[in-house]
Amino acid sequence: MDEITVDVRNLSKQYGNFKAVDNISFAVKKGEIFGLLGPNGAGKTTTIKLLTTLSPPTSGNASVAGYDIIKQQKEVKRNIGWVSAEIILDDDLNAWENLGLQAALQGITNWEENADNLLKYFELTEFKYKNVGKFSTGMRKKLEIAMALLNSPEVIFMDEPTIGLDVGTRKMLWDLILLIKNEYKVTVFLTTHYMEEADQLCDRIAIISHGKIIALGSPTELKQKAGGYAVSLEVNNGFDISSLKNFHILEKNKNKILIEISSKDNMLDVLRSINLENLKSINLITPSLDSVFLKLTGSTIKETEESVDYRKFYSMVRRNMQ
């Protein structure tokens, strides 16, 4: 039986009449990369704040590393690391001083050896005494992750860690996240609104929308729920469209035809039905997490984000926190 590191039970967070997190439940297995995927404003950051004891829940409960987030907050904090969406380093200090400040804030004693090992592992040793204000974005992210690992946590929470990064730096960070899992044996709880990121990194994903968990499973399991395999054909002018009468044509645009099929094996049925002499190309389109979200919510993540009035939402949150 899998050991559970994060156990969430009917957790809710309400600001006035607005439910930022609405009765969510899930469990994170020890040693996995668990992704909370959803658009901006879906409740991802609020969930992390609840699990890291930065904000109390309105109702429900959870345990992290075996400790109750309400009754055992100090124990929870001692056993977690946290990487925020924004880099939070002191630019006036060097890398070593930032690590020392982190140790002081967390009450970590005898931290120097672990800090040296982390700097070596993340290839930052030669920059140990360099002012971090002169670090590249990638180096700054590396240092922030090293700081999150300084207390040897059981779980590291990463809230939108690659937002705003260029493609190269984002890929570098993906490699670091996999390293954390494989080399440091740390459970990773990751929030993101990037479909590709969740697909590439996560062992399992919970999709959150409007504060509710609407799906949970591995990337493969979620994509299987969406179905939606398709075949894209590019044909010559003499192509006989009637040869596809037994298939559901999703779209026809000049010499390009998109056909829905129930499984990738049905691609052979399409090939058997048509005159191959009039076929220029054929491609199988597999389900994606984008199609999963679209099927579950009726909109894409981008469309969901655009529908949220953030100024109204944050104004309401501030009023209810006063």
Across the structure, where does each feature detected by a protein language model lie?
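Generic alpha-helical secondary-structure signal
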Residues: 79, 101, 114, 225, ...
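ABC transporter nucleotide-binding domain
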Residues: 175-262
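Short, charged/small-residue-rich alpha-helical element at the C-terminal edge
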Residues: 228-303
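ABC transporter nucleotide-binding domains
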Residues: 3-6, 13-209, 215
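ABC-family P-loop ATPase nucleotide-binding domain
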Residues: 1-12, 299-322
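Short, basic, helix/turn surface patches
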Residues: 140, 240, 285, 307-316
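Residues that scaffold the ATP/ADP-binding catalytic core of kinase and kinase-like folds
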Residues: 72, 148, 225, 292, ...
